[in-house]
Amino acid sequence: MSISVTAVIYPGAVVAEDAIVHDYVVIYPGTVIESGVEIFDHSVIGRVPKSAGSTKRKVDNEYKKTVIGKNSVISVGCVVYTDTIIGENTLLGDNASVREGCIIGNHCVIARNVSVNYNTKIGNYTKIMDNTHITGNAIIEDHVFISVLVSTTNDNTMGKTSQYIEEMEKGPYIKQGATIGAGANILPGIVIGNDAMVGAGSVVTKDVPEKKVVMGIPAKIIRDVG
C-alpha cells in the first residue's frame, strides 16, 4: 500500500494493500478502494451531498457504500460522491465529478471535467469525452461514445415547478452502441436507439430510432448508419 502522508482516510474506509493514494486525497467512511486502484492528488471519494436549503431536491447526507473497482484510475481533482459504484479498469479524468447514486461500469472513460449527476447509470466500455454534462436520472448503456461539450437535461419545466418530483426529472436513455457528436444537446426523456448516431451540434427534441443518423436544429433523420 502506498498512501501519501497528506492523504486523509477516515475510519470505516477500506483501502486495498496495493492501492496508491497520492497527496491530499480525502477518502470518507463507507468507501471501498479495491486492488490496483490509483487515486491522484486532491481527489475526494465518498463525500456526501449538501444542499444548503437552496434546492428543491432533498438529499441524503449520510455516508453510504462507495466503491472504486479494481485497477481503476481516479485522476487529479476528481470528486466521487457517496453511494456510487465505479467499475473495474475505469478512468476518471482530471476534475471529473460523479454525484451520489451513480453506477459506472467496467472499462469506461469519464474524461476531464465531465460531470455525471445523481442516480445515473452508465454501462461497460462507454466513453464520455471532455467537458460533457450527463444529467441526473439518465441511463447510458454499453459501448456508447459521447463526444466533447455534449449537454443533456432532465427537466422540461426548467425549475419552475413548486417542488421536486423525481418521476418528472428524467434524463435521456442512450442505448447500446450509440454515438453522440461534439456539442450536441439532448433534451429530457429522449431515447436514442441502438447504434444510432447524433451529429455534432444537433439539438435532439425527439426520440432517435436505432441505426439512424440525425443532424440539425432540431435534429432530423438524414440516413441509416453505415
Which residues make up each language-model segment?
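Structural signal for interior beta-strand "rungs" in well-ordered beta-sheet cores
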Residues: S2-A52, K56-M215, K220-I221
